[in-house]
Curated annotation (Swiss-Prot):
PANTHER family: FLAVODOXIN 1, FLAVODOXIN 2. PROSITE patterns: FLAVODOXIN, FLAVODOXIN_LIKE. It holds the Pfam family Flavodoxin_1. Residues 4-166 form the Flavodoxin-like domain. It comes from Buchnera aphidicola subsp. Baizongia pistaciae (strain Bp). Keywords: Electron transport, Flavoprotein, FMN, Transport. This is Flavodoxin. GO terms for molecular function: electron transfer activity; FMN binding. Low-potential electron donor to a number of redox enzymes. The gene is fldA. The keyword Metal-binding does not apply. Belongs to the flavodoxin family. The keyword Electron transport applies. InterPro entries: Flavodoxin, Flavodoxin/NO_synth, Flavodoxin_CS, Flavodoxin_lc, Flavoprotein-like_sf. The lineage of its organism: Bacteria, Pseudomonadati, Pseudomonadota, Gammaproteobacteria, Enterobacterales. Its cofactor is FMN.
Length: 174
């Protein structure tokens, strides 16, 4: 399997911790992990398979490092790349903006031709009012983690999602 680049932005450490677990469960021999705060355009362009992790802040805003990187992200050509997204959010205190960061990244990346997204995730088991991270079938565009309200479910969700990612990658690459 090709090398997978895992890029995350984190203020509190939650998204970084999720990224580290994804790195572990995907396989440290086939993936590398990068803080978006120390990333440039070329770092991302090296990979054909990318996993982006973002948290949502305040009223549906990107985590600050992703917000700073957004102009660069818009310049990257994601044609023929495979993308998976994950995010952290608080479904109780920010129920109207739950994990909107995933949707913001998705809407930038999807403008590239032939980009493939993998890793959609069920919205069952979460309680929120609204999210930009939902697709037309009301599934999340990627893995959603709520360390504030459901920390006991995080590890199992990450394990299940990384298995799903591996299965989807195997079918796309074989």
């Amino acid at each position: 399997m090709e090398s997978i680049g895992i890029f995350f932005g984190s203020d509190t450490g939650n998204t970084e911790n999720v990224a580290k677990l994804i790195h572990k469960y995907i396989g440290t021999n086939i993936s590398s992990i990068h803080d978006i705060a120390n990333t440039n355009k070329k770092d991302i362009e090296l990979f054909n398979i990318l996993i982006f992790g973002v948290s949502t802040w305040y009223y549906g805003e990107l985590q600050c490092d992703w917000d700073d990187f957004l102009p660069t992200l818009k310049k990257i050509n994601f044609n023929n790349k495979i993308i998976a997204l994950f995010g952290c959010g608080d479904q109780e205190d920010y129920s109207e903006y739950f994990c909107d960061g995933i949707g913001i990244l998705y809407n930038v990346i999807r403008l590239s031709k032939n980009v493939r997204f993998i890793g959609s995730w069920t919205s069952k088991g979460y309680s929120f009012e609204c999210s930009k991270a939902l697709d037309k079938n009301k599934n999340f565009l990627g893995l959603v983690i709520d360390e504030d309200r459901q920390p006991e479910q995080s590890n199992q969700r990450i394990i299940q999602w990384t298995k799903k990612i591996k299965t989807e990658l195997n079918s796309l690459l074989n």
